[in-house]
């Protein structure tokens, strides 16, 4: 057995340490201050306890400033919260408490569920525990000891968790003072390193193991950050997000609603449907030159989904349907008992369209697009306005091309996606390549080729953007049928939304026997590229509403102008103004009610009308208009013709304006 361990440091230097040396020993060998600020170590990228013995490899000392420390802070905060709860309410059982995005939660078995009023008490107790600065220490227990100890404490859920751990796997028990828990780790050095930049956010109910047949537990959500400034920024972002909640704004703007009879499907009101159709019309114009729009059936026999693999891989997310008569008359032997499925994706239908008729290599690439309504089952608790629904429209396209055309097609798709996002005002975009997962179809040679091409494409995207577009790699995150690009955009308050995707597919063309005739008159399987820009049109609309806080750009707004009169003497002129704006292509309503003008302005501001034109006796005499913008107290007076021309230009979609500008430039 080696008497020393060889460690490579970030600066490239290599040092030897005696076998059994811990991460803390290594940190202390560098400096006392580093040892004091260290919270963990990483060996070859794997995060470990500071008290763990080091092994040969590349070592990093992790401090609170390291992004990786955030998960440790949140993990430890969850343990501190669990201890606080059991100190305050003895007899409460702890179950599981993972780190989640922006925070953590812990589920408890308690006779009476927690209320929001309990949270300040728990926070106070947590601060006491943190102030004790008890060290986290790890022990390895036998399965028998763990079950015996937890059973004696009345922790039946922990006994069940112990039983679920595979035989031969270590059972780690972490102590913080007298309190302990079953946990895989790692943890920081002590409770004091959690700090005080945390907040408990809300309480909720949750079924044990997410199964509605099991007991209902009481869940507490919390958030924790490296410092108070980060916590304050996060809480400010949440407050902003609450103001911008598309569900609230959707009601105020009269765009859509949901109801019990149709969980997860949208009831579009007139104004909401107008925005939806504006988005679809915009996307149709962007696709008109390069894509052929098609429409595949929504209901198809399960045999097709068995061939595609969805019935095996994706069945739990699908809706199965059959004749209502067959369902209500199971004993009727004459009933049609075929089982169909509502399509969860458009791709199998597009393969059928590609296969219909012989295709030559000269015809490739063939680009098929569809605004396809798809249905996917989501648990009722996961549904969230337009962001998480059961029925939605995908701006889907599938490109069938040769292997040699793959790179050019991916770049062409990238240019389109970035251009669309820019038209909606999104400037900060991240493009990441997701590579092969462990479970996948296709040979390694196919994956090697596809990943090599897409890696080169990613480099080209980064180079062409001159630093504007950030790129990255997501190892093992690809789909089972091929690598993919994921496009993430950042909104006005800093939240990130993954929207667009470009996915190479080795699976469906092979499963369905799709082919084209190549230059040697041989049958050849095409490369299939899945492409979505918005992803879900409903979700993208929800993102737009929240990004703009309901203050939609004029070209997107369902109602662009309200003409409001101060006095009935100006009504005739108000009608003339409204008609002139309509003739210029704007969506206009009039408000000639016998109400004070400030009341009218407030009312239309609540519904987020972007432009209110005020007309009184003076404006009628001078043939002018008084323009008031949403969110501004300023008023601008201008001549009617000038106002119509200016607003018509502003209401012109950006792609239409570019085309007109290019035409003018060419004519000049």
From Swiss-Prot:
Domain of life where this protein originates: Bacteria
Short name of any one Pfam family annotated for the protein: HGTP_anticodon
Free-text cofactor note: Binds 1 zinc ion per subunit.
Location(s), subcellular: Cytoplasm
Cofactors (names): Zn(2+)
Catalyzed reactions: tRNA(Thr) + L-threonine + ATP = L-threonyl-tRNA(Thr) + AMP + diphosphate + H(+)
Any one of the GO CC terms: cytosol
Coiled-coil ranges (or none): none
Keywords: Aminoacyl-tRNA synthetase, ATP-binding, Cytoplasm, Ligase, Metal-binding, Nucleotide-binding, Protein biosynthesis, RNA-binding, tRNA-binding, Zinc
Enzyme class: ligase
Documented EC number(s): 6.1.1.3
Region (Catalytic): 245-553
Record-stated family: Belongs to the class-II aminoacyl-tRNA synthetase family.
Subunit description: Homodimer.
This protein's name: Threonine--tRNA ligase
Lineage of the species this protein comes from: Bacteria, Pseudomonadati, Pseudomonadota, Alphaproteobacteria, Hyphomicrobiales
